[in-house]
């Protein structure tokens, strides 16, 4: 009989922060393109080691409003914001990624920063 692994207590879990962002561009983007954009910009600016430390992860993206949520490590929020800020072009489309805000929970992030874009 296999034993079930115990879950980590909250004191040992990774502390995450969630960043709300908006893509300002004439072109449209899919969730997969945004995921690739975040990874490529993070790798270019921070390198492989830095990206592994920051742990960027796209949680949700709405292609209609071009807004989304990305998760990262609590200690390295500014590194990811910096990496996203430097993006100016992707797949031949000019764009700007604007950070709307940072929060410790997705619920609070939606309520505070993404409510005006129709997120619930």
Curated annotation (Swiss-Prot):
Keyword Lyase tagged: no
Record's GO cellular component terms: cytoplasm; ribonuclease P complex
Single Gene Ontology BP annotation: tRNA 5'-leader removal
Assembly: Homodimer in solution. Component of RNase P which consists of a catalytic RNA component and at least 5 protein subunits. Forms a heterotetrameric subcomplex with Rnp3. Reconstituted enzyme missing individual protein subunits is suboptimally active, showing each subunit contributes to optimization of activity.
Keyword DNA-binding: no
Primary location: cytoplasm
GO molecular function: ribonuclease P activity
Record localization: Cytoplasm
UniProt keywords, alphabetically: Cytoplasm, Endonuclease, Hydrolase, Nuclease, tRNA processing
Enzyme class, broadest EC rank: hydrolase
Family: Belongs to the eukaryotic/archaeal RNase P protein component 2 family.
Function: Part of ribonuclease P, a protein complex that generates mature tRNA molecules by cleaving their 5'-ends.
Temperature dependence as stated in the record: Optimum temperature is 70 degrees Celsius.
Catalytic activity: Endonucleolytic cleavage of RNA, removing 5'-extranucleotides from tRNA precursor
Name the UniProt record assigns to this protein: Ribonuclease P protein component 2
Organism the protein comes from: Pyrococcus horikoshii (strain ATCC 700860 / DSM 12428 / JCM 9974 / NBRC 100139 / OT-3)
The protein's Enzyme Commission number: 3.1.26.5
